Structure formats: structure tokens, C-alpha cells
């Protein structure tokens, strides 16, 4: 089995308990991070009528937050799609949001027309894409000119110190144990800290975005650098 296929199968296995584990393991902070990202995008992008796709949508958390943010910012979502390669995750998403279109597909080969989107989001999923540069090229293809890409991700820590040490201890020792109890799949939650360590620094990922044809509009780190938000415009 190829690396990408193994990652997808891992998410299939933990899909039934994924939402519960996320809320517990992040102490609910992941919802706040998502809301801040969506609201920031809505404030930067002036169009009122929006076509949105959430890539690596998982169980659909960002779909709901996009809808709430649009209502709050008095914008109209003409169309919103969730795309994910994990059938297990999509089964949960479809139960939660029966009126939303969900598509089983990978980020590196999106079944979307070129220049068809105003906004594309991917939350805590880009580090799981093996062919990352190909995915970024796809994001640029499906976005309209001046369309917005927003990425939320756990990035490699850049500084040491007490807080960084606490973060690392939690990720490597506590999170896998709790995640394993909730999901009965400890190895899936051991994958998380390993995937973060194997991902890019903030500067490295920004360079990849620029090379893919994006201009960085905003960057912000949350919770002492645990999570990072990248907002970019397609040139």
C-alpha cells in the first residue's frame, strides 16, 4: 500500500470518533481557530456572493463555520462543496450536513472546473498530502483570479523554551494516549506529532505558496504557535 493510501485508510478507521477526539485533544481550540480563519477571509474578500470548496474536509467542521461566518458577515454562499479522499470521513459529514455536496477525491486531483471558486480552504490536511506541490497547483487552477486560499495547519516549531517543550511533551506523550483511548487506534494519534515534525516551517510553506502562484495576504499563529493560519491570494 502506498503512503497516501495508508494515510487515507488511517482516517477511515478513526472517522467515527474523529469529532469527539478533536474537541477533547484541542480543548475545543480547533473550533476557535477555524472561526478566526473564516472570519478573517470574509473580511478580506469583498465579494458578496461566494463559491467555496473545503478540501480535506473530514467530517465537515469547516462547512458549518463557513456558513455561520457568511451569515454573520452578511454574505451569500452560492455553492459550497466538501472534498476528501476518506470515504469514512465523508460518511460522517453527509450525516451531519445532508444538504451539502461532498465529493470523494484527493487534493492533488480536484474534480472542479478551472477558475470556478472564490474561496478554497484546507484545515489540518495539507501536511497529509504526499504530492503537496501538485495540490497547491490544483488550488491555483480552480480559484478565480484574486480568489482566496486559506490554510490552517500545525507547523514545525521554530523556537525552543518552556512553552515549546510543553507543546512537544503533550503532542508526543499525552495526545497519542488519549487519542488512542477515544478511537481505539493509538497509532493514528502517534502519526500526528510525527507528521508535524516532518512538515515545513512557516517560511518554507510560505515559499511553496509563492512558487505555486499565490501572494500572502495574512499569517497568524494561534495558541503559542501550535496552529498557523495562512491566507493567500491567487495572482
Curated annotation (Swiss-Prot):
It catalyses: a 2-demethylmenaquinol + S-adenosyl-L-methionine = a menaquinol + S-adenosyl-L-homocysteine + H(+); a 2-methoxy-6-(all-trans-polyprenyl)benzene-1,4-diol + S-adenosyl-L-methionine = a 5-methoxy-2-methyl-3-(all-trans-polyprenyl)benzene-1,4-diol + S-adenosyl-L-homocysteine + H(+). The keyword S-adenosyl-L-methionine applies. Gene3D superfamilies: Vaccinia Virus protein VP39. S-adenosyl-L-methionine binds at residues 59, 84, 123. One of its GO terms (biological process) is methylation. The keyword Transferase applies. InterPro entries: SAM-dependent_MTases_sf, UbiE/COQ5_MeTrFase, UbiE/COQ5_MeTrFase_CS. It holds the Pfam family Ubie_methyltran. Its EC number is 2.1.1.163, 2.1.1.201. Pathway: Quinol/quinone metabolism; menaquinone biosynthesis; menaquinol from 1,4-dihydroxy-2-naphthoate: step 2/2; Cofactor biosynthesis; ubiquinone biosynthesis. SUPFAM superfamilies: S-adenosyl-L-methionine-dependent methyltransferases. It is an enzyme of class 2 (transferase). Keywords: Menaquinone biosynthesis, Methyltransferase, S-adenosyl-L-methionine, Transferase, Ubiquinone biosynthesis. GO terms for molecular function: 2-methoxy-6-polyprenyl-1,4-benzoquinol methyltransferase activity; demethylmenaquinone methyltransferase activity. Methyltransferase required for the conversion of demethylmenaquinol (DMKH2) to menaquinol (MKH2) and the conversion of 2-polyprenyl-6-methoxy-1,4-benzoquinol (DDMQH2) to 2-polyprenyl-3-methyl-6-methoxy-1,4-benzoquinol (DMQH2). Belongs to the class I-like SAM-binding methyltransferase superfamily. MenG/UbiE family. This is Ubiquinone/menaquinone biosynthesis C-methyltransferase UbiE. It comes from Campylobacter jejuni subsp. jejuni serotype O:23/36 (strain 81-176).
Amino acid at each position: 500500500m502506498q503512503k497516501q493510501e495508508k494515510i487515507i485508510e488511517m482516517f477511515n478507521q478513526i472517522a467515527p470518533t474523529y469529532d469527539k477526539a478533536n474537541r477533547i485533544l484541542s480543548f475545543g481550540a480547533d473550533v476557535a481557530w477555524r472561526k478566526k480563519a473564516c472570519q478573517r477571509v470574509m473580511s478580506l474578500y469583498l465579494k458578496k456572493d461566494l463559491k467555496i470548496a473545503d478540501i480535506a474536509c473530514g467530517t465537515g467542521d469547516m462547512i458549518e463555520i463557513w456558513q455561520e461566518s457568511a451569515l454573520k458577515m452578511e454574505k451569500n454562499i452560492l455553492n459550497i462543496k466538501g472534498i476528501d479522499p476518506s470515504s469514512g470521513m465523508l460518511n460522517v459529514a453527509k450525516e451531519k450536513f445532508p444538504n451539502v455536496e461532498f465529493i470523494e477525491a484527493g487534493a492533488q486531483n480536484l474534480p472542479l472546473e478551472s477558475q470556478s471558486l472564490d474561496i478554497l480552504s484546507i484545515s489540518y490536511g495539507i501536511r497529509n498530502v504526499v504530492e503537496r506541490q501538485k495540490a497547491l497547483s490544483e488550488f491555483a487552477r480552480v480559484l478565480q483570479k484574486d480568489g482566496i486560499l486559506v490554510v490552517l495547519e500545525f507547523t514545525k516549531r521554530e523556537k525552543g523554551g518552556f512553552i515549546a517543550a510543553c507543546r512537544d511533551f503533550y503532542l508526543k506523550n499525552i495526545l497519542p494516549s488519549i487519542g488512542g483511548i477515544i478511537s481505539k487506534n493509538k497509532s493514528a494519534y502517534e502519526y500526528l506529532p510525527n507528521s508535524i515534525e516532518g512538515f515545513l516551517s512557516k517560511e518554507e510553506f510560505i515559499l511553496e505558496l509563492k512558487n505555486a502562484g499565490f501572494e500572502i495576504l495574512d499569517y497568524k499563529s494561534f495558541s503559542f504557535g501550535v496552529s498557523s493560519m495562512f491566507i493567500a491570494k491567487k495572482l
